[in-house]
Amino acid sequence: MQIIFKIFTIILLTIITGIANAKTNKLTIGLDWFINPDHAPLIIAQKRNFFKDVGLEVEMIEPADPNDPPKLVAAGKLDLAISYQPQLHIQVDQGLPVVRVGTLVSVPLNSLVVLKDGPIKSIADLKGKKVGFSVGGFEEALLSGMLQKYNLQMTDVELININFSLSPSLIAKKVDAVIGAFRNFELNQMDIVKRPGRAFYPEEHGVPSYEELIYIANVKNRNNPVFNKFFKAIQKATLTIINDPKSTWKDFSTYRKGLDDELNKRAFKDTLPRFTLRPQAHDLNTYKDFGYFLKEKGIIKKIIKVETFAKP
């Protein structure tokens, strides 16, 4: 009888332990920016319990500085971070131990923006002007590629770090142009305050297409099975947004105070067609082509095999 009781106890403890372990996996993700419609799949997955359904507890952390999240991933202080493909190439070239494990937006959002009624009518007009930026290295890479098409160098412009203050700095004429303005956000922001902007798109001015927003992890965690659960929830959330933009906008806008405004409403609508429907898939050639571009422009020192830093 005692043997049966002991066996029963062991089985019961095993079941209880298994349930406890299966309850939740905690995941911390550093955002690239303050919460905005670019993060809609994460917000919807959170609000509709898609993360919870796959056994995840996800904490989203907004950065004090948009340059910080990749460094925190490299240091093992974040599980994931939202970053940018161009920035990833540069960081890997510098030896940062990070790898792309998924994609949020697979097409460019970034743009070079000036005031529509201002003196800058062409990229060639930027010579001797001030250009604001927020993310070092990455945005300089895009700007460099755009300038070179018009026989200009980075030394022909004055770069000013304006952190999150892109549109305000441009409107206040603290700078003549900003690189890093998202075409789905800053252009709407400027239009709302009746100071419309003119955008120059990198992919139309000498820069190869690239994935704007990606998920990165530490190379040591590139095959973490928890990420598969995360992307399963993200994919479900993305499809839900595409299929039901009206109710998902309501969920997004009520996630916290300050999101339910005209700017976010416009940006939400403009961002919908840009979310990738298969977050773990990616085009190898997109990474190869962009790597060659950066090497040609002297922004990275060497070509690194894509498979080492971009998990297919």
Protein language model regions, located:
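Periplasmic-binding protein-like
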Residues: 38, 104-114, 195-219, 231, ...
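Sec/Tat signal peptide C-region and signal peptidase I cleavage site
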Residues: 18-22
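Secondary-structure end/capping motifs
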Residues: 223-299
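Short, hydrophobic secondary-structure boundary micro-motifs
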Residues: 54, 100, 249-251, 302-304
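Short, glycine-/small- and polar/acidic-enriched structural segments
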Residues: 23-163, 167-172, 176-184, 199-200, ...
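Positively charged n-region of N-terminal signal peptides that target proteins for export
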Residues: 1-7
